Structures are given as structure tokens and as C-alpha cells.
């Protein structure tokens, strides 16, 4: 769609967890029996040049409004700098933080709150449409708030309310003391 890569596993050889219902480029088009796909995520908008996230380099208190109403997101980089170019990022590893609420196109998401996505960009994987084919190095990976990362989609996993950080969950977002590679 529009030059975006698929975010589900495209080889169908393994059944590891991808973004599921949270992304229109994965299982999201099937939300509400296929009638109500979700809004594009912050990363998808960033990749297309429709959103420029605010780079966070120091600890701070932030009010992040609903993505679909305000088109705003935060980017946490592995360094204090980032070129903010979604389809050619430098550095290639970063996090996107967005607020998803169950209204409008997002009404049929499995839950609401702050969605934290880890990005590990590889131009080859994006060009070959193999972004999330390796469970060992996902290109776009949801960081589950409850810490419960399913290891398989074979049992019908496509998203759950505990995937997103609830409002006021500041104690969960202490990622500043860790490198990008350490957080999963």
C-alpha cells in the first residue's frame, strides 16, 4: 500500500508474532470482521512523510494527544540526533511512541493507550518486503506493556489490551537508562 512494506511475516514459513490488529499493514484490515481497519500508525505515517515525530533526547514529562486527532508522535533515538526521515532513517534504530484511542477507525483495536514500537530499519528488508520475517530481528516490533510477548500467532494472537501502556503508566516507560538494543 502506497510503497509501505507489509508488516506481517510474508514467507508464511513461521508463525511468530508481528503487529497484528494494531497495524493496517498486518492483521488490522480484519478488525470488526473486515469492516473497520485501523488508522495508519505513527511509524507508517512517518515512513510516508505524513508525520514528523518530535525527537526526545532528555527525560521530560510529555502530554501526547491521540494520534488520529493530532498527528503527533515521539521518536526516541539510539543517539541524541536523528535525521527524522522515515524511509531513510539515520540512525536506523529508534522507538516511536504514539497515543492510540478506540474511536473512529481505531474503535476496534484490542485496547487503548500508549503504543511503543521498536524500529530497526534495513533498506534491504524494506525493499524485499521482508521487514518482519525474522523473529530474531523484527524491523517493526511492538513492545508489549505487560511484558507478555507471545511467541506464536498459531493460537489466534493478533493483539490484546495489555499490549499498550495505560494512561498514567509513567513507571513503565523508564527506557532512558537502556540502549535501543536492550529494550524488547
Language-model segment annotations:
Residues 1-50:
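The catalytic-center signature of Zn2+-dependent metalloproteases
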Amino acid at each position: 500500500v502506497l510503497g509501505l512494506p507489509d508488516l506481517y511475516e510474508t514467507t508464511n514459513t513461521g508463525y511468530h508474532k508481528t503487529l497484528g490488529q494494531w497495524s493496517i499493514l498486518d492483521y488490522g484490515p480484519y478488525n470488526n470482521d473486515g469492516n473497520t481497519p485501523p488508522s495508519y500508525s505513527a511509524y507508517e505515517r512517518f515512513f510516508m512523510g505524513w508525520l514528523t515525530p518530535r525527537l526526545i533526547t532528555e527525560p521530560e514529562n510529555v502530554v501526547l494527544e491521540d494520534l488520529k486527532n493530532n498527528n503527533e508522535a515521539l521518536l526516541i533515538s539510539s543517539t541524541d540526533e536523528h535525521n527524522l526521515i522515515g524511509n531513510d532513517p539515520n540512525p536506523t534504530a529508534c522507538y516511536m511512541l504514539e497515543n492510540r484511542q478506540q474511536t473512529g477507525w481505531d474503535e476496534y483495536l484490542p485496547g487503548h493507550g500508549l503504543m511503543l514500537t521498536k524500529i530497526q530499519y534495513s533498506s534491504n528488508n524494506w525493499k524485499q518486503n521482508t521487514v518482519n520475517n525474522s523473529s530474531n530481528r523484527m524491523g517493526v516490533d511492538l513492545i508489549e506493556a505487560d511484558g507478555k510477548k507471545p511467541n506464536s500467532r498459531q493460537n489466534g494472537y493478533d493483539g490484546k489490551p495489555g499490549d499498550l501502556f495505560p494512561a498514567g503508566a509513567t513507571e513503565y516507560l523508564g527506557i532512558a537508562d537502556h540502549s535501543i538494543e536492550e529494550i524488547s
